[in-house]
Amino acid sequence: MFTDRKANSLKAKRQQQPWPKGKPFKILSLDGGGIKGIYTAHLLRQCEQNLADGKPLASYFDMIAGTSTGGIIALGLGLGRTTEEIVSFYETDGRRIFPPYPASLLGKAWRFVTSFFRPLLNHEELEAALKRRFEDDTLGQAGPRIVVPAFMMPKTEIAVF
């Protein structure tokens, strides 16, 4: 999953999936918000439990898209993780990946100013946690289509995975 994006280009690796015929195309869209993704994860877990048919939540969708923390959840669902595993990810790794917001006005101002020059998150902690959870999984192994837009720092380049 963590390879050179240029060498592993989307056009070279993308596999066409059939368009569902005779039924609506269902998309689950998940927004960002850092550690607040734990709320989304809990809500999705409740939805999966309420369905009570034993099927994973991802099997109900043709595409799962997510930005930022929503992208992490989209990857988890698309690569076959249960909603319980996704909740566990946030409970176990969330505090290391998503630093707390500063309480003081000066701290908030500093965070705002520095956000223009560097990422708000510690990418090493995020990458280590994702490697632990996804190991050698690839997007090609996903059940539904997965869409995760990203902003590549410091090149200010947009990428869609």
Where on the chain are the PLM-derived regions?
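Helix-boundary capping/turn motifs
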Residues: 19-20, 65, 150
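Short, structural beta-strand-to-alpha-helix junction motif
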Residues: 56, 129, 133-141, 146-147
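Non-catalytic, mobile gating and regulatory segments of ester bond hydrolases
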Residues: 1-18, 24-25, 62, 86-87, ...
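A generic N-terminal leader/anchor concept
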Residues: 18-19, 50
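Patatin-like phospholipase
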Residues: 24-29, 35-130, 160
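Active-site gating loop/helix substructures
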Residues: 35, 141-161
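Short, well-ordered loop/turn elements at secondary-structure boundaries
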Residues: 22-24, 58-60, 142-144, 155
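Terminal, contiguous helix-loop blocks that mediate binding/assembly
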Residues: 11, 102-104, 155
